[in-house]
Every structure is written in C-alpha cells, then in structure tokens.
Amino acid sequence: MVSLDTEVVNDLKSKVNIADLISQYVALSRTGKNYIGLCPFHGEKTPSFNVNAEKGFYHCFGCGRSGDAIEFLKEYNQVGFVDAVKELADFAGVTLNISDDREEKNNPNAPLFEINNQAARLYNILLMSTELGERARKYLEERGITDDVIKRFNIGLAPEENDFIFKNLSNKFDEEIMAKSGLFHFSNNNVFDAFTNRIMFPITNEYGHTIGFSGRKWQENDDSKAKYINTSATTIFDKSYELWNLDKAKPTISKQHEVYLMEGFMDVIAAYKAGINNVVASMGTALTEKHIRRLKQMAKKFVLVYDGDSAGQNAIYKAIDLIGESAVQIVKVPEGLDPDEYSKNYGLKGLSALMETGRIQPIEFLIDYLRPENLANLQTQLDFIEQISPMIAKLPSITAQDAYIRKLVEILPDFEYNQVEQAVNLRRENMTITDHPVSNLDASSLTESFTDENDYSSLESVMPVDFEEAYYENNVKTQQTYRRSESAQVVQPSVQVPKLSRSEKAEEMLLHRMIYHSSVLKKFSQDENFRFVHKRYQDLFDKILLEAMVYEQIDESHLASELSDEERSLFYQIISLDLPDTASSQEIKDLVSIFSNEMEQIKFEELIQQLATAEKAGNKERVLELTLQIINQKKKL
C-alpha cells in the first residue's frame, strides 16, 4: 500500500506534462512557451487560461483559478485529493495501490449521485433479467438497439408498479436525499416513482455520475401523451446545461477539437453504431449558451446534425447564431429524416458518409433556409438580398463571396451579378466604417493609444528587460486574441486586461526575481527597512522568505500548497510572468525605485491628512512639526 506523502505525489506529477493532461479537457493553443485556452472554470469568450508546461501549473487571468495537475483534476472533476491522484496516475499509466492518510471531504452531492446510480442499476437489471424486460428488449432490438448498445449506455426499464424504486431504495437513503433526487413524486403524504413503464436512458454528467433519467414510452397501450419524460430540475441536473453522452464523447472531442451536435438519444446511438464517438445530444431541448460555453472549452468546430424537418432546421438557425458562423458546419439530413431514420434507410455506412462528406457552410444553409417562397415579387427579392448580403460580405475569401453571389443570382429572377455584387460591396464598406470610425489610423498609433490607456509605462533608465514589454507580453499578448481588419490592418484587443498600477507591476516582477534568483531574495531579506507597498505582496514575500529559510530552496509546488487560495492565485500569476532568465542589478534597482516612489507619495499624503487634523485641533506645535516633515517629504518626490 502506498501512502500519499509529498514525495510520491511530486514524483507522479513529474511524470505528467500538464499541457497534455489539460488538453484532454480544454482546447489549447500554443503561444510561445505557454498554452492558452478558454477557462473551464468561468464563462468567457476570449482565452485567458494559461498553462505552463515547463513549470507544471495553470493560471487563469480572468477568474484567478490556478494550481498544478492535481488541483486541476480536483476543480474540473469536482473530486477530492485521493480521486484526483488516482485520475492522474491513470493518465500517467502508473499503478498506485493507495492508502490515504488524509481525511477526504465528502462531496455534498455524493448521496444524490449514489441514489441515481442505484436506480440506474435496478432499471438495467429489470430490462436484462425479467419477463417484461425480455419484451422490452425485443422492442429495442427492432429499433436497432442491441445488447452491446444497452450495455454501453446502461439502458434500463421502469416497471409498471409505481413504487418499485421507492421500495428498493427507501431503506438506504434518508427522506431529504429522496426528495432531492428527482426519482419520486410526493402527494398527500404518499410517495410514487417518477417513472413507470418506460424505457430508461440514464443521464450522466461529464464525469460519469448518474444525475437523472429520460424515460421513453414503448407500449402501444400506453395512454400517456409525452413520448419522453425527463427528470425534473434538481441540484445535480439542469437540462439547459447537461449534454447526453458527453462523458463518453469528451476524450474524442478534446483530441479532435470537433463535436457533432444532435437532438436525441437514438441519433447519438446511431452515430455510435456508425463508429462516430464525438457526438452529444441536447436531449430534445433547444441548444443554450450554457451548452455552447461547455463545449467551446473542448471543441473548436461544431457540426450540427439536426432533424431534417422544419423544427430541426429552425434549431440549426438558432444554433448558428449562438455558436458563431466561423465555428459551425451543418449536415442537412435529406428527406426530412433524423439521423437515426437515415441510418435505417441508408445503413450505418451511409450515415457515416453523410456526416463526413455532407457538410455545408452556414451561409449555404442560410441562403436555403431564409429563401422566400414567393420570389416572383420584386420587394421580396430585395428583402432577401438585404438579409443575405451582410453574411456574404463577412466571408474572408473573395472567391467564396463570388460563389455565393452567383448562387443568389441563380435564385433571383430580376437581378444580375453586378447588382447583387454592388449590394455585398456596400455592406462590406459599411462594416469597415463601423469597425474603424477613425480614419488614417495605423497599427503603431493604435498600439500607442492602447498602451497609454492601460498605463504600461516603461522604466526611465535603460534595462536589460523592458518593463512595459515584459508585462505586456505576459498579461496582454498571451491572454488575448486579436481581430485584424483586412482593410485597415489594425490590431484590436478583444477584452480589457485587469489594470495594475505601475507600482503593482514592479512589485510582481521583483517577487518573480526573488523566487528564481536566490541572490536577489537574500539581498532583500537582509534589509530590515525594505517593505513592499501593497500588503498582499509583503505577505507573499514573507512566506517566500520562510520557505527559503526552512527548506533552503523554493519548491513551487510545496510553497503553493502552504498558501491560501487568494495567495496561491497571486503566486501563480507572478510565476507566470515571462521574464528573461538573467536579472541585472540595474533592473532590480529600477523596480524598487518604481514602488519606492509610490511609498514616498503615500507617506506624503498621510502627512497632509495629519496636518489637517492638527490644524482643526488648534495644535500649533504639531502643525509646525508636520509642516517641516511635509517639506522634507516633498523633496523626496
């Protein structure tokens, strides 16, 4: 049995490239030494999540979350320390027979996961080992659901009795857990199972925990109106957030950075049988922003494979608007069929071929979707051009614009190529004017303006590392994506960087130097008069100094484990700074000079306040004393 001491944990972490680990969950792009992606811990549209593979940590400049590989697994999978270590060991291919000396904190949702897991097991047993289950399996087999599919998706059967689950689980869980589980209805002091006489599809979260169910009616004599009934909203189940099959699809999505989006369970099952694994379903509900935010953490491309009927096409139209045209492709399922029906008519190979080669771009779908029925009317044609021309104008390729202009001309009986082209060009010009209202701007002038706005001041003296560029490189370039206008060639930041004062930037850079240069830390540890301006930096300095004194070195992982959440976030932010390896004495002097000046300014303002208090109190002796101090302090500024 292995005890999880520091040495064992650190040895395990050393075997793992943290960027490889996190890329299983988040789509990462390389930028210099680091990797960036959309933060999985808060909703964002612009990447601010940094991963440093060399030093083995991550840090989000948006929400401040940070840590090492184990901390990431704890946060992302909502598990305790031991489970995170086990997951990391599995990823590294290391076998650990763990005996944990630490007290695991209970996940507050663990009982809800467990009661739903046990219900899923009971439903599956009923399907696989009862006479009623045999009839239900025959029904499923006729619809292409084999025993292999039943096993993979843990499909089950709710019996006709309305108290089967209650009788089997009521003695194992308390009333509060049962009430919160979503498995029961309560009426007039009676308890009934929420699902009866239905094929049961367990709904799991992305970590594989059962969080709810969707029950499908299967018998002809079933008078219930709803084809599917879902678990009502609970603490652990939110239909606007969860996606069916995400736990099984996640590894392939993360690897390929592409996800197929479908409407229902049977569609996903058909795709699985066709050998396509990166497929999820929104369970019949409309796609939401929550769904998209989750998937964008793993995928860069979305392929919409919705039903071919009008409802499915309407859903595609709304999804394009939610996701953004540049990241979407559409598979139009012919003949108004859904993917499951298509696989039955044309075989699994036919479905696989359709999913891969039948993709079209959003603009092609929108031209067909928005095409009016009555194109004999001139005003209708004009309105159609007004709708489509901005979409064509946004296309980055002139060749693509030309192709879709020609497609419009084929549709419109009263318009020729040059007329439609003129409408598109006008839209393009209007877009350029809107994007760049100030004329005669070049890239350098905008960069200077942006720099001034965010107070990225350079050091007055010549330094080996430029203060402005060092901080800009880390806190701007690696956090932001930039939109480059083809017409003006102007780089525009897509988000605002959290502002730090010039002093705060200098303090962070000095702390970085102390962490990685023992001579710098030693120099300031021997200066009794040295202090940082801001308390959070002074507190961190004290703990860095203590780490060095006790252990005669600074171990980043160990130090991080000794810090509070707020201190740890600040620590990771500081060691994320991408500074040159060498540090000159002149650089250190200049950094200290920057925040020393602010310290002197603070002292000056405090003396002014004290003077006002003394004057108000009529203390002439104190007024004279403070006046002299203010004069002397003014000379230091």
Curated annotation (Swiss-Prot):
GO terms for molecular function: DNA binding; DNA-directed RNA polymerase activity; zinc ion binding. One of its GO terms (biological process) is DNA replication, synthesis of primer. CDD domains: TOPRIM_DnaG_primases. Binds 1 zinc ion per monomer. Mg(2+) 2 binds at residues 307, 309. Residues 257-338 form the Toprim domain. Mg(2+) 1 binds at residues 263, 307. PANTHER family: DNA PRIMASE. RNA polymerase that catalyzes the synthesis of short RNA molecules used as primers for DNA polymerase during DNA replication. Monomer. Interacts with DnaB. Belongs to the DnaG primase family. This is DNA primase. It comes from Lactococcus lactis subsp. lactis (strain IL1403).
